[in-house]
């Protein structure tokens, strides 16, 4: 029996070995491409999860959830320093951050920025303590008398309390 007759006997539809290997190569290539895309999707998902805190510059008091207050995770709290809320005891500074809807009491150990004052924009970095107070380890104040963080200005505009430009 010749080689061609032997191939036809094993493959009754008349497809030769060459067609089978091309099909196998295509299938293998598809699996490789699919696998690479899956690995890429997982990598992008992990990167987005890792940078989740940095994607959003800060949260306003109204944006906070119960999980934010109990998880112990670090984040940035932004808003306005409420009028009449600033008090200092030794190196401890206490103040309230508001977005005119909700307020959050903040405790900061250290020297506040020179531009820190009541009624001005502020971003505090830290986490909630077991006592329910936001424990800031860094406080950022506005840069000049016209500066309010864009996210805060947008939030205040939506709520109808924005008086700036």
Swiss-Prot record:
Transmembrane regions listed in the UniProt entry: 30-50
Keywords assigned: Cell inner membrane, Cell membrane, Cytochrome c-type biogenesis, Heme, Iron, Membrane, Metal-binding, Signal-anchor, Transmembrane, Transmembrane helix
Topology in the lipid bilayer: Single-pass type II membrane protein
A GO BP annotation: cytochrome complex assembly
Record topological domains on the Periplasmic side: 51-165
Residue stretches in coiled coil: none
GO molecular function: heme binding; metal ion binding
Side Cytoplasmic, residues: 1-29
Covalent S-S links between cysteines: none
GO CC entries: plasma membrane
Residues that hold heme according to the record: 143, 147
Localization terms from the record: Cell inner membrane
Stated family: Belongs to the CcmE/CycJ family.
Reported function: Heme chaperone required for the biogenesis of c-type cytochromes. Transiently binds heme delivered by CcmC and transfers the heme to apo-cytochromes in a process facilitated by CcmF and CcmH.
Descriptive protein name: Cytochrome c-type biogenesis protein CcmE
Gene behind this protein: ccmE
């Amino acid at each position: 029996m010749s080689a061609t007759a032997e191939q036809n006997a094993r493959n009754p539809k008349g497809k030769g070995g060459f067609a089978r290997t091309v099909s196998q190569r295509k299938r293998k290539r598809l699996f490789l491409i699919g696998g690479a895309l899956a690995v890429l999707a997982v990598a992008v998902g992990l990167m987005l999860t890792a940078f989740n805190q940095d994607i959003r510059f800060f949260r306003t008091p109204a944006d906070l959830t119960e999980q934010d207050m109990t998880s112990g995770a670090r984040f940035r709290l932004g808003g306005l320093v409420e009028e009449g809320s600033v008090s200092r005891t030794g190196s401890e500074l206490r103040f309230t951050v508001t977005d005119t809807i909700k307020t959050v009491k903040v405790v900061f150990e250290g020297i506040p920025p020179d531009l820190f004052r009541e009624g001005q924009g502020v971003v505090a970095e830290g986490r909630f303590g077991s006592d329910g107070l936001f424990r800031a380890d860094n406080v950022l104040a506005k840069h000049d008398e016209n500066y309010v963080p864009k996210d805060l200005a947008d939030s205040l505009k939506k709520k109808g309390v924005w008086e700036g430009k």
